[in-house]
């Protein structure tokens, strides 16, 4: 049998002194303790602000040049990556291939724990090869403890292919050095339930992924102000949201907004451009394409040239 690596020194494996009596707390005391400990996630994000900003910048540049974004992880980390990737098409009307989540064990691991599969670095490397990752792409390796072999295998394979690499972990660099382009450390301390990184580590990872993907989409012109003008109108809730955006930004009535939305093919961004410029759908789409889908730049460019 292979000798097990000692991991007790890792921050995510250490014992939290504030929760030593966890099994003796009342429900209200449990809630209060979680609330106090979860405050560390905000501090962790603040401490990693520079690295997160750099990650947004290089990822937006890569996607702007035709690249793709991949999240790679196992267990909770993998599920969070898949979740964030899955939210991009409905929120920003992106192609499903643009942002992808890779989890050790594949789709089955999303609903049933397959933690034993994270110990195979060759599987991580294989996942990179299967998706034909190239130098235009960005790979984010997510591992709370920073040691997941599946993730390290994927990162090394991505580096060999020339892709930009980002690491996201919850342990100090001196405990687990990782050689990547951007190293994001989200230090939230020991978990309330020792070693259960689905707790603070999972929460702060979700926060960081929210910031990364949303920041990238902002840079790519997928929003106008703070509105998701590239929303995919696929159900009644999103249809209503689209109409309200048009009403708020144009002062049209709900009925008028509905007509405009239909004329645009239910594309909010195009509908706004049509309203503000007087262009039809075809001309409006051509103008948007000329400005790489950035609504604000397209409107300003049109006004400058008329």
Swiss-Prot record:
It catalyses: N-acetyl-D-muramate 6-phosphate + H2O = N-acetyl-D-glucosamine 6-phosphate + (R)-lactate. Its EC number is 4.2.1.126. It comes from the Bacteria. The active site is at residues 87, 118. InterPro entries: Etherase_MurQ, Glucokinase_regulatory_CS, MURQ/GCKR, SIS_dom, SIS_dom_sf. Keywords: Carbohydrate metabolism, Lyase. Pathway: Amino-sugar metabolism; N-acetylmuramate degradation. SUPFAM superfamilies: SIS domain (SSF53697). GO terms for biological process: amino sugar catabolic process; N-acetylmuramic acid catabolic process; peptidoglycan turnover. Residues 59-222 form the SIS domain. GO terms for molecular function: carbohydrate derivative binding; carbon-oxygen lyase activity; ether hydrolase activity. Coiled coil: none annotated. NCBIfam families: N-acetylmuramic acid 6-phosphate etherase (TIGR00274), PRK05441.1 (NF003915), PRK12570.1 (NF009222). A lyase-type mechanism (elimination/hydration) is suggested for the cleavage of the lactyl ether bond of MurNAc 6-phosphate, with the formation of an alpha,beta-unsaturated aldehyde intermediate with (E)-stereochemistry, followed by the syn addition of water to give product. Belongs to the GCKR-like family. MurNAc-6-P etherase subfamily. Specifically catalyzes the cleavage of the D-lactyl ether substituent of MurNAc 6-phosphate, producing GlcNAc 6-phosphate and D-lactate. This is N-acetylmuramic acid 6-phosphate etherase. It comes from Rippkaea orientalis (strain PCC 8801 / RF-1) (Cyanothece sp. (strain PCC 8801)). The gene is murQ.
